[in-house]
Amino acid sequence: MPLSYQHFRKLLLLDEEAGPLEEELPRLADEGLNRRVADDLNLGNLNVSIPWTHKVGNFTGLYSSTVPCFNPKWQTPSFPDIHLQEDIVDRCKQFVGPLTVNENRRLKLIMPARFYPNVTKYLPLDKGIKPYYPEYVVNHYFQTRHYLHTLWEAGILYKRESTRSASFCGSPYSWEQDLQHGRLVFQTSKRHGDKSFCPQSPGILPRSSVGPCIQSQLRKSRLGPQPAQGQLAGRQQGGSGSIRARVHPSPWGTVGVEPSGSGPTHNCASSSSSCLHQSAVRKAAYSLISTSKGHSSSGHAVELHHFPPNSSRSQSQGPVLSCWWLQFRNSEPCSEYCLYHIVNLIEDWGPCTEHGEHRIRTPRTPARVTGGVFLVDKNPHNTTESRLVVDFSQFSRGNTRVSWPKFAVPNLQSLTNLLSSNLSWLSLDVSAAFYHLPLHPAAMPHLLVGSSGLSRYVARLSSNSRIINNQHRTMQNLHNSCSRNLYVSLMLLYKTYGRKLHLYSHPIILGFRKIPMGVGLSPFLLAQFTSAICSVVRRAFPHCLAFSYMDDVVLGAKSVQHLESLYAAVTNFLLSLGIHLNPHKTKRWGYSLNFMGYVIGSWGTLPQEHIVQKIKMCFRKLPVNRPIDWKVCQRIVGLLGFAAPFTQCGYPALMPLYACIQAKQAFTFSPTYKAFLSKQYLNLYPVARQRPGLCQVFADATPTGWGLAIGHQRMRGTFVSPLPIHTAELLAACFARSRSGAKLIGTDNSVVLSRKYTAFPWLLGCAANWILRGTSFVYVPSALNPADDPSRGRLGLYRPLLRLLYRPTTGRTSLYADSPSVPSHLPDRVHFASPLHVAWXPP
């Protein structure tokens, strides 16, 4: 007969009616008993013939594709002019005096951040925007393009202008000017000015002779409109495999591709197809390139840098065969849903491409992308705004993967020791935290995103049209992309984006100028940055507490008035460094801080209410006697594991689930095991702060016996049969706690010290976790342990009790590395009326 829930509780000593602990507890270490209980609860039966269950409530398998929901009305968030001050170290020194080694090192890591991948795989531009929403292909394309454009305008992305140059907006950093790969090449007075790009110092761009020469030809500009003969496109050589050698021109100013093996030709331009608004530039350039590079027989495109001339001149005057969008103007409409009708809505569609305020040299950047992008909801609570997801997972996969640096995250006990206090709390919201940290320009070629232009994107996804690479596009071929869906989508989008539809329909390649979210390096850098800033704030205001995890920054002070003064001072300091805070999202928590999914108060820590509700829902939906897919079990364990430290039996209670996940087998919940777990999670106990103290109780054991030293009293006992030494030591610690009630116990066993009881026999682990809950352990060497003699059966010998002081740890968060006392270079601060007369140190 299966074990009933009541019997199981008694067995685990969770009920009071159990016999003396010294007899009952060692029985739980018995292998035979553990095996019988596992059989009764159906824990060991991993091989099942019934089909697995793949969904429990909201939990589906770890690799199942939960299809994100597309919102046609998404708004692109605005990014303020984020520019982290380059002299951030000096500004911090002015604020707090000399920086500690730790703070200095961390701030130097991100000024600028560097990225060294082992191997970079370049993908075709078609993979730039992921077709995540097949129903909303065109809409998603334009929303994503608009998001990328917004990031570029905010100075977060570089725009690839040519193989070795890029343009960007915003304030340049010194490394974007001084370095060989980051020299500032152009600076223009107007952002999208109508002047042509011209180098201000010789020899900075590759093939610098092209620049001034074209400028002079632009001034003359004697070439009138030419008949459209379309020979240039027809003569393109397709062997280079570069996207630039394909049908439509690129926005980075590529002019054409030299025919393979041609000699010096001077009349190329006059025969090339042209459009009036760019005829002078294109022809001058093409004849010049043909002359200067005439003997080259490579099929590679040659770069030419220019601004589009003033777009106020109408672009409808000449034939426009270079631009897919404007070509429709000169064609006959193929149906009532032809794009011709949209293109003729307005005269002036604006320039084909835009250029940034500044231009820099970059390492060689191919016309490719290294990761795809798509849009999702900003977060579960905000579905009106979109968030860009960047997939640079290639750097985390395969043999060439980058092993990202590890960094310390405070565990639950350290966090409680640090933050559980009677302070008033407030949390700050850093807007777009990742986009604060600048990347070195040399990283740009590895972090490329972009799109191949609307025509290719639509063609790739529609079944009835095919764009054949390097084939001259005929009029009929042009209309292949016309369809009712595309027409309706573009008409709706025209209301939103207006003439930007034209700009967004062109191909573009963008590289990251600030750290992107899709790379494993970014969380590490952000954690280093915010922890260094908080360290500076803590030293400036020793009577307060500032702490951060990633972009979550919290401030604590003894009273509300004090907290408000601190908030004003810290906000001004952060703004002076160039850190953007979102004042609308500042939250004042009172005395219970909500942080990292926990509620932390003076009484200790508990999980937040929404997590408790999730757990209740999970148990409500959990099926009994049905095998559940181990991937779904991973999800369940993830949720239950977060709240495990707040239950009686802790992590050991989940061990059967862990075992089935490790074996990649389905798990079947028996009614008793489910009832046991749900009762465990029904009553959650806070994890309390550890207090410093003097250790008075010691425990020790040998495989055959145990000994305790409680003050001046000594006790000993023997086990019925010899036990493994770690099990014996754990039992001794449990006896010490139950006999003395002390929350501080000295032991010489490292496994007991670690307080991880998952490797012990299952029943013993569960019971020990409950008995030792809230106990702190101090290490005492065996030779000095007063309980060593009693454990060996010698009660007569008394070793003196040690004066063992216990100091609770705040973890490896490098928070309280005692910094050398630094003389402040500031005049004495005016002290506001503060209830504190002493510096507040962490509890």
UniProtKB/Swiss-Prot annotation:
InterPro entries: DNA/RNA_pol_sf, DNApol_viral_C, DNApol_viral_N, HBV_DPOL, Rev_trsase/Diguanyl_cyclase, RT_dom, Viral_Replic_Matur_Polypro. Residues 347-690 are annotated as: Polymerase/reverse transcriptase domain (RT). Residues 357-600 form the Reverse transcriptase domain. Residues 219-250 are annotated as: Disordered. Residues 1-177 are annotated as: Terminal protein domain (TP). Its EC number is 2.7.7.7, 2.7.7.49, 3.1.26.4. Keywords: DNA replication, DNA-binding, DNA-directed DNA polymerase, Endonuclease, Host-virus interaction, Hydrolase, Inhibition of host innate immune response by virus, Inhibition of host RLR pathway by virus, Magnesium, Metal-binding, Multifunctional enzyme, Nuclease, Nucleotidyltransferase, RNA-directed DNA polymerase, Transferase, Viral immunoevasion. Residues 223-235 have a biased composition (Low complexity). Mg(2+) binds at D429, D551, D552. Residues 178-346 are annotated as: Spacer. Belongs to the hepadnaviridae P protein family. Multifunctional enzyme that converts the viral RNA genome into dsDNA in viral cytoplasmic capsids. This enzyme displays a DNA polymerase activity that can copy either DNA or RNA templates, and a ribonuclease H (RNase H) activity that cleaves the RNA strand of RNA-DNA heteroduplexes in a partially processive 3'- to 5'-endonucleasic mode. Neo-synthesized pregenomic RNA (pgRNA) are encapsidated together with the P protein, and reverse-transcribed inside the nucleocapsid. This is Protein P. The lineage of its organism: Viruses, Riboviria, Pararnavirae, Artverviricota, Revtraviricetes. The gene is P.
